[in-house]
Amino acid sequence: MIIIGRKSRNTDQALIKAGIELIAQGNYDPTVRAICTLANVNQGMFVYYFGFKEEYMKVLFQKIYEDYLSKLQDYPEKDAKAAIQLQQIFYRMTKYFIENFNTANFLTEALYHSKAASYFTNYRVQHFIFVRTLIEQAQREGDICSDMNSYEIYTTLQSILIQPIIIKNNIL
């Protein structure tokens, strides 16, 4: 009788958790060895689950981005006017970026500046579409000026959002 091994449900999650921890520490391009050491998993299991590091990084990014989106969308004022909802979302964005500075940097790098950015095209607009829809609704409700388009308003609000992060992390 031949016994074929089954994939453990926890090993792949341990590898993802290790990657998230390394990124939170500022290691945006962790080695397979570092990931496996932190996860207490041998490197053969890394290959078994993900094949190549590039595939692992895609899965890791997807997990981090989905967690970020869920934090943005999990606010108590969902029945409120759009302007109130925007206030809640930008508060959550600011809080996330301050509390998870290195992870936020990783997301920014992956979304816009990394060699892998093209893989994340489907993701990089989800948060923008979500916020832009609320901006346009707030404009229709008369709570936000209508002489600017939603992208201009989004980038203006985004620049305001970044100020507490710069101050807290002594970037300038």
Model-identified regions with their sequence ranges:
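Generic hydrophobic, amphipathic alpha-helix propensity
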Residues: 10-19, 35, 60-64, 68, ...
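N-terminal intrinsically disordered/low-complexity leader segments
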Residues: 1-10
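Amphipathic alpha-helical segments used for helix-helix packing
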Residues: 97-116, 168-171
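Hydrophobic/aromatic-rich alpha-helical bundle segments in the mid-to-C-terminal region
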Residues: 109, 139-172
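Amphipathic alpha-helical packing segments from all-alpha helical-bundle domains
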Residues: 69, 73-74, 115-141, 152, ...
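Helix-turn-helix
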Residues: 14, 22-55, 59
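Hydrophobic alpha-helical connector segments
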Residues: 73-102, 150-157
